[in-house]
């Protein structure tokens, strides 16, 4: 086995964790049953989806826990939270126990917290073991979170295709089994080692092959999912998906074997000479202390160069608009930000708004997808739509690696890619407002999945680049506190519009206490228009963030080129 192979085992372990712990994607698959068992309104159901997202508010606790406990202990803490949250919900929906609404709300909160903890563990592992290619490792690992709904649907159909409540049982048990499987590589993590230029090129080839295999996996699930309604066929497709996931473990060994050694030559693959990492990829084989000293010197020198290079630009940007717009902008990438520094950064709050009105909107849409399809008369298509969203989210997350593969030929800031990714979401909401056909619903779901998936994956790398890689476990969890806020506000808006248009709904407060059913385009038409306007705010915020950070990225491109 080649040198450094153990780090690839750790990466594949994070991929498996992500693939089987994205349990928030299948909420729409059992939300109607949960609503029926609890006899609650759409507004109250929305609060339960918000509770799941509110778990992300406590994601920073995982980052703090990692400072005091071994990683494997934190992993099983996350597993226990999921087992507790989803396990009791499963018993409730099976009507084996009876719980008040408030306790169900707390269970959803605990279950959502487990998802965020799993994600944080994967972020830390990727950044620790791939300092030179952290963006590629993060995007690849995070992308597989998008196939969770498809995998859970296959597992459920392989057992029985008629019981939607099975999803809750799987949500509780499967992450526990996966955590047990990946325990060994996590316990035997290799010590991070400085990377030579040759090793970086070799790693780049492995990442390229892993991304190709990931693309094949996504296409496999997307095109064969429609055949999985039959239990026997679902089992065959599930075995094929399992084979592709296991193949990820052996692919790095195959690529780096002697028979394939010629492929690591720069003459064969010029792309392998690309500097995939935006932060100090040229740091070579010195000690960690030397690396930190070099990075510190580069940051200081780059800031001086920035001041000189910007002098001519400032002359042309004397107008009041630019003076306000560029106030306190970031001057260099990779600088570590404490929580206090983060709170005083304009760039962080612009970034926060861009995420709140961009990626979070896609998550709220997925939470409401079950009710949306039901109201439009496509209730039988709910599972297909959930899987379509999940799979397209996977492709979107996978596309987040494109800037790293293209940055040798296309020097474009990652925040610019982030802004461009929000555009399809706005188009999708316009399309939903125009027509309620199943074709439009599918196309819009795919666009929103692609858009939100890219945002989710790119955001981790952007947080690392703008506010420091060593602080990402805490800083990114602070960023995603926008998710429960957006989920509450946008979901509340959708629920109020839904219940107010329900058949037989009265104008008094009775509609808040009784289960309602709304059918027709009127149920979500106004909501789609509001969501479209909000996504435009996210788009504008994203372009403002790009405008403020583009010089820091371009200066960094120039430094890496030299």
Residue ranges and their predicted role:
Residues 34-35, 65-67, 155-161, 224-227, ...:
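Interfacial helix-cap and linker-helix signal at transmembrane-aqueous boundaries
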Residues 85, 98-117, 440-454:
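Hydrophobic core of transmembrane alpha-helices in multi-pass small-molecule transporters
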Residues 24-34, 220-233, 332-334, 338-395, ...:
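Extracytoplasmic gate region of multi-pass secondary transporters
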Residues 27-30, 34, 115-142, 152-153, ...:
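Intracellular juxtamembrane helix-capping segments at the cytosolic ends
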Residues 55-56, 130-184, 198-224, 392-395, ...:
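Glycine-rich segments within core transmembrane alpha-helices of 12-TM secondary carriers
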Residues 73-88, 414-430:
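Structural signature of the two symmetry-related core transmembrane helices
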Residues 47-67, 84-85, 91, 150, ...:
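Central cavity-lining transmembrane alpha-helices of secondary-active solute carriers
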Residues 186-344, 350, 552-562:
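Long, low-complexity inter-transmembrane loops of multi-pass membrane transporters
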């Amino acid at each position: 086995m080649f040198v450094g192979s153990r780090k690839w085992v750790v990466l594949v372990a994070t991929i498996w964790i992500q693939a089987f712990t994205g349990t928030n994607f299948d909420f729409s698959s059992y939300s109607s049953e949960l609503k029926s068992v609890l006899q609650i309104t759409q507004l109250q159901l929305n609060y339960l989806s918000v509770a799941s997202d509110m778990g992300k508010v406590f994601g920073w606790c995982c980052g703090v826990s990692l400072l005091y406990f071994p990683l494997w202990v934190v992993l099983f803490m996350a597993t226990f939270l999921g087992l507790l949250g989803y396990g009791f919900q499963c018993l409730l929906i099976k009507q084996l126990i009876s719980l008040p609404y408030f306790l169900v709300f707390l269970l959803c909160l605990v279950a959502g917290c487990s998802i965020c903890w799993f994600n944080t563990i994967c972020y830390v592992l990727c950044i620790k073991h791939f300092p030179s290619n952290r963006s590629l490792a993060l995007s690849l690992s995070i992308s597989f979170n998008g196939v969770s709904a498809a995998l859970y649907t296959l597992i459920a159909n392989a057992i029985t295709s008629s019981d939607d409540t099975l999803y809750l049982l799987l949500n509780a048990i499967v992450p526990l089994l996966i955590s047990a499987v990946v325990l060994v590589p996590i316990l035997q993590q290799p010590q991070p080692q400085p990377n030579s230029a040759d090793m970086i090129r070799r790693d780049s080839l492995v990442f390229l092959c892993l991304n190709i295999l990931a693309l094949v996996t996504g296409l496999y699930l997307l095109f064969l999912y429609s055949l999985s309604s039959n239990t026997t066929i679902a089992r065959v497709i599930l075995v094929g998906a399992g084979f592709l996931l296991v193949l990820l473990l052996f692919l790095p060994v195959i690529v780096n074997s002697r028979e394939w050694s010629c492929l690591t030559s720069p003459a064969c693959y010029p792309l392998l000479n690309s500097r995939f990492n935006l932060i100090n990829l040229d740091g070579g084989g010195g000690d960690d202390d030397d690396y930190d000293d070099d990075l510190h010197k580069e940051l200081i020198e780059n800031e001086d160069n920035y001041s000189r290079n910007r002098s001519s630009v400032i002359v042309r940007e004397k107008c009041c608009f630019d003076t306000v717009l560029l106030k306190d902008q970031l001057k260099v990438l990779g600088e570590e930000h404490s929580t206090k520094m983060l709170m005083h950064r304009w760039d962080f709050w612009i970034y926060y708004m861009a995420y709140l009105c961009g990626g979070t909107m896609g998550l709220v849409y997925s939470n409401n997808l079950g009710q949306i399809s039901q109201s439009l008369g496509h209730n039988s298509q709910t599972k297909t739509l959930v899987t379509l969203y999940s799979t397209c989210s996977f492709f979107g997350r996978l596309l987040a690696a494109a800037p790293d593969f293209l940055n040798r030929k296309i020097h474009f800031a990652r925040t610019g890619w982030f802004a461009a990714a929000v555009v399809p979401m706005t188009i999708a909401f316009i399309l939903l407002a125009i027509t309620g056909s199943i074709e439009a619903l599918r196309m819009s779901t795919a666009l929103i999945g692609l858009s939100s998936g890219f945002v989710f994956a790119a955001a981790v790398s952007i947080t690392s680049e703008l506010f420091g890689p060593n602080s990402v476990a805490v800083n990114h969890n602070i960023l995603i506190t926008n998710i429960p806020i957006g989920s509450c506000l946008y979901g509340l808006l959708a629920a109020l519009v839904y219940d107010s248009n329900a058949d037989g709904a009265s104008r008094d407060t009775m509609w808040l206490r009784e289960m309602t059913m709304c059918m027709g385009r009127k149920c979500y038409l106004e909501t789609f228009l509001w969501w479209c306007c909000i996504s435009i705010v996210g788009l504008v915020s994203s372009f403002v963030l790009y405008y403020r950070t583009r010089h820091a990225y371009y200066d960094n491109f120039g430094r890496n080129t030299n």
